Amino acid sequence: MEPAADSSSSLQTFQTEVTEDSFGKFILTCNIARIRGEPSNVYTGLNIGCRLPECPPENPFEIYYLMKDSELQENNDWIRLYLELAVATTDRNREASDFGLSNLEIVNVAVDAEGLLNAKNAIFYIRYKDLYEARLGNAVFDRIAIVRRIFDEDTGRFTLVGQNQSSDIIN
């Protein structure tokens, strides 16, 4: 944290929280940090817009914007975070040591949003290979993580909602 321009001011402590709204479902919310002690008028109930995204009837990788390799490299940190959160929060049957999150290989990403990658509200279709599952001999290792990103400027609430599905749903 950088000190304020006025050298007489002290450092401020900010507070925020990230919550998992439902065990085993990828519904994570984070309220924007505010100075500790300031009143909060943030709505705490589950927003109707937070329903789990579903795969459209058409192949999302053919109808929505397909990220270029250079865009994937440039935005890999947060795309990868979305993918890892989707896998870790929806597959609770794996032991923590078995998650193999490093064994998730992103194949391609489609974006459904106005403003594309910089949109505050968007749905990301992340096709990936679960190389951990492939090594176990499981047939379903080509998967899709569907992640909805929602940012409400009025409340300062940031929400990620998502799920994993077999890529067979689009073939």
UniProtKB/Swiss-Prot annotation:
Question: From which domain of life does this come?
Answer: Eukaryota
Q: Name one Pfam family in it.
A: protein_MS5
Protein family (similarity comment): Belongs to the UPF0725 (EMB2204) family.
NCBIfam families named among the record's database cross-references: A_thl_para_3677
Name of the featured protein? UPF0725 protein At3g25080
Organism phylogeny: Eukaryota, Viridiplantae, Streptophyta, Embryophyta, Tracheophyta
